[in-house]
């Protein structure tokens, strides 16, 4: 069952049509175009968030679209906690969701695998599996990483595991 917040997020991100991964070179280019369009439209979602002061990630990829990297951040008690984010597109994509990593948090929470990969198995991966090939990178960020940050970062801050770094 999907809650109202998830439904609202889903409605702001376009669903994808093309079922292709990095192995299908010709079709992969079309899927990448769809991914970028979804991210741009999700950026309308992000653009709306920017206007309200709650945008939270920036991404870019290598030329092939198989390695993604950037920054994500989480606001807690009016302080901005910023993290590097990275992931590779699996060769079995879109059947397999990307494993999003926050390398600097590696080993700091039980809800993380080696290399800083966040645990999405209980909540996000079943949702992804039901929505192949309609879900893409924008969905992984909004429905996978965002809720993880919302739960884990405040907990890590309260435990003193991560501290605010003034980037000025």
UniProtKB/Swiss-Prot annotation:
Any single Pfam family the record assigns to this protein: UFC1
Keywords: Ubl conjugation pathway
Gene3D superfamilies xref list: Ubiquitin Conjugating Enzyme (3.10.110.10)
GO CC term, one of those recorded: cytoplasm
Superkingdom per UniProt: Eukaryota
Active-site residue numbers: 119
GO MF annotation list: UFM1 conjugating enzyme activity
Cited InterPro entries: UBQ-conjugating_enzyme/RWD, Ufc1
GO biological process: protein K69-linked ufmylation
Annotated function: E2-like enzyme which forms an intermediate with UFM1 via a thioester linkage.
Similarity comment text for this entry: Belongs to the ubiquitin-conjugating enzyme family. UFC1 subfamily.
PANTHER family on file: UBIQUITIN-FOLD MODIFIER-CONJUGATING ENZYME 1 (PTHR12921:SF0)
Protein name per UniProt: Ubiquitin-fold modifier-conjugating enzyme 1
Native species: Drosophila grimshawi
């Amino acid at each position: 069952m999907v809650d109202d917040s998830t439904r609202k997020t889903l409605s702001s991100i376009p669903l994808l049509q093309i079922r292709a991964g990095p192995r299908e070179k010709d079709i992969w280019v079309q899927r990448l175009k769809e991914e970028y369009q979804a991210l741009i439209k999700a950026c309308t979602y992000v653009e709306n968030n920017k206007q309200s002061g709650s945008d939270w990630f920036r991404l870019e990829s290598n030329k092939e679209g198989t390695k993604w990297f950037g920054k994500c951040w989480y606001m807690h008690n009016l302080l901005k906690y910023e993290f590097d984010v990275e992931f590779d597109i699996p060769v079995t994509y879109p059947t397999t969701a990307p494993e999003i990593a926050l390398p600097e948090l590696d080993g700091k929470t039980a809800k993380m695998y080696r290399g800083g990969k966040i645990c999405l198995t209980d909540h996000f991966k079943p949702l992804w599996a039901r929505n192949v090939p309609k879900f893409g990178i924008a969905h992984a960020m909004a429905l996978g990483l965002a809720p993880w940050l919302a739960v884990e970062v405040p907990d890590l801050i309260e435990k003193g595991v991560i501290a605010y770094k003034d980037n000025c």
